[in-house]
Amino acid sequence: MPPVRCVIFDCDSTLTRIEGIDFLAGPVREESQRLTEQAMRGLVRLEDIYGRRLALIAPTRDQVAAVGERYLAELVPDAGAVVAALQGEGIQVRILSGGLLPAVLTLARALGVPDWLVGAVNIFFNADGSYAGFDSASPLARSGGKLEMVERWRPALPRPVMMVGDGATDLETRPGVDRMVAFAGVVVRPAVVAGADTVITSTSLAPVLPLALDHELPRAPGARALYEQGAARLAAQSTERPS
């Protein structure tokens, strides 16, 4: 495949090490994590647990803002450098997440990804900042929704397109993208690893750069050290799924 022209990243457990909704959960974290893991492994439909998790947690505006800051504190190694290097090579970077929009936008803005290239689930608050609900009509709050969003984006997507993510909802985009990369550097989900075209087992996102460039050297000299690091990490693992 030639070098890609667009990379779409998942957010939770891909660009950042945490699952934002689980981080919010506090005393109900164990139950929230259980529901999240079931959905990310494809064992239950996302729409069956999305609203349940938020109803359990009832997050306030301030708590959701804190998730955004925590995202930044828990960035996956080299996430920022990889995004900058991709953009420097003229590759469009998008973020597609089932996370909460205000928190995901905090991460995106810190990484230099414009708001219009971000998809996430909006959340609503009362005047006092208490939880008032979420956008239940969002495709990203249901299984298959990420593929639906990729299809909505299609007219504006530079191609080829590569998806990078860890969960079953990311794998569902496979029919709409040119390459699906399973990022297993935070959480390993066997079904996602088995279904992806390529797997990154490194805890760093550096391998995304040589994969996106199809192993061509970056034009920007400043990106070459990151490229070489990523290529070395790929060489140390078996990345291609057996045919």
Where is each model-derived feature located?
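A polyampholytic, Gly/Pro-enriched intrinsically disordered region
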Residues: 134-146, 204-207, 218-229
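Acidic, Mg2+-coordinating phosphoryl-transfer loop and its flanking beta/alpha structural elements
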Residues: 97-98, 160-201
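Short, charged, surface-exposed secondary-structure boundary motifs
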Residues: 126-132, 190-199, 209-213
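Conserved Lys-Pro-Asp/Glu-containing loop-to-beta segment of HAD-superfamily phosphomonoesterases
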Residues: 141-171
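Alpha-helical substrate-recognition element adjacent to the catalytic core
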Residues: 1-122, 127, 203
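Glycine/Thr-rich beta-alpha phosphate-binding loop at enzyme active sites
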Residues: 115-147
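Membrane-embedded alpha-helical bundles of multi-pass transporters
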Residues: 222-228, 232-243
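Anion (oxyanion) recognition and catalysis
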Residues: 87, 112, 155, 175, ...
